[in-house]
Swiss-Prot record:
Location within or outside the cell: Cytoplasm
Pathway: Pyrimidine metabolism; dTTP biosynthesis
Protein name as it appears in the record: Thymidylate synthase
Physiological role: Catalyzes the reductive methylation of 2'-deoxyuridine-5'-monophosphate (dUMP) to 2'-deoxythymidine-5'-monophosphate (dTMP) while utilizing 5,10-methylenetetrahydrofolate (mTHF) as the methyl donor and reductant in the reaction, yielding dihydrofolate (DHF) as a by-product. This enzymatic reaction provides an intracellular de novo source of dTMP, an essential precursor for DNA biosynthesis.
Assembly description: Homodimer.
Length: 283
């Protein structure tokens, strides 16, 4: 929690104002932030200085793992995080590749599970990684990549957290996740949970021990309409100790994650938190 608050304070103190063309808003911005999560010792990085809704973050991750491309599927899992980008983004609404209501296009999990090959067919990046790690293989390229510039025009949003690189040292699994851009008051709350849970899940279904998850953010920013709440409310609060995250031990395989797993298979204990803060969201 301290590293999260340190980043927020750094942006407030050292950030530079940048005009964001996509949203039409100003952002207070810093370049490069590195966060580390101790998954092996179950130090769950859930924000405590405001109430955080971890279930939606896990549901979104499950949707990525399943390769979903429709906001309705994400809602069925338990999150509305894609409703706005799928249905309120004017550029996407005018895009000829949009298939209709709730369609997200070829974003995130679609790239992870069905990356289009130039000679036809698709590559299932995630399955390859799971198969390798399950056999104890680390080819130094166990990388799940969502960033496909050749298909940006076919999706409602470029990926923000675009790369997850898994590494084995003995029987301990590590993760390096890279994020090009982060709305720190809103998005980072989700992204920290997802990086942590992704390593925990991958370790469980490949029979490895989870180690550390490293989370790099390139452009970390606070939107102008979020600044007052961050500076004058959230940063004035004292954080609580980290809670713990629990996964149903019956989850054994990638197929389990693809089929029967729901939010009921996850739990958080020991979570103390301050009152919620309603930060504005920028589409």
């Amino acid at each position: 929690m301290k590293q999260y608050l340190d980043l927020c304070q750094r942006i407030v103190d050292q950030g530079v104002w940048v005009e964001n063309e996509r949203t039409g808003k100003r952002c207070l911005t810093v370049i490069n932030a590195d966060l580390t999560y101790d998954v092996g010792n179950n130090q769950f990085p859930l924000v405590t200085t405001r109430k955080s809704f971890w279930k939606a973050a896990v549901a979104e991750l499950l949707g990525y793992i399943r390769g979903y491309d429709n906001a309705a599927d994400f809602r069925q899992l338990g999150t509305k995080t894609w409703d706005a980008n799928a249905n309120l983004n004017q550029a996407w609404l005018n895009n000829p590749y949009r298939k209709g209501e709730d369609d997200m296009g070829r974003v995130y999990g679609v790239q992870g599970r069905a990356w289009a090959k130039p000679d036809g067919g698709h590559i299932d990046q995630l399955k390859k990684i799971v198969d390798d790690l399950s056999r104890g293989v680390d080819d130094r390229g166990e990388i799940l990549n969502f960033y496909n510039p050749g298909e940006f025009h076919m999706g409602c949003l470029r990926p923000c957290m675009y790369s997850h690189h898994f590494s084995l040292l003995g029987d301990t699994l590590y993760l390096n996740s890279t994020q090009r851009s982060c709305d720190v008051p809103l998005g980072l709350n989700f992204n920290m949970v997802q990086v942590y849970v992704f390593l925990a899940l991958m370790a469980q279904i490949t029979g490895k021990k989870p180690g550390l998850a490293y989370h790099k953010i390139v452009n970390a920013h606070i939107y102008q309409d979020q600044l007052e709440l961050m500076r004058d409310v959230q940063l004035k609060r004292e954080p609580f100790p980290a809670p713990q995250f629990h996964i149903n031990p019956k989850i054994k395989t990638l197929q389990d994650l693809e089929t029967w797993v729901t939010l009921d298979d996850f739990d958080v204990t020991g979570y103390q938190f301050h009152d919620p803060i309603q930060y504005p969201f920028s589409v």
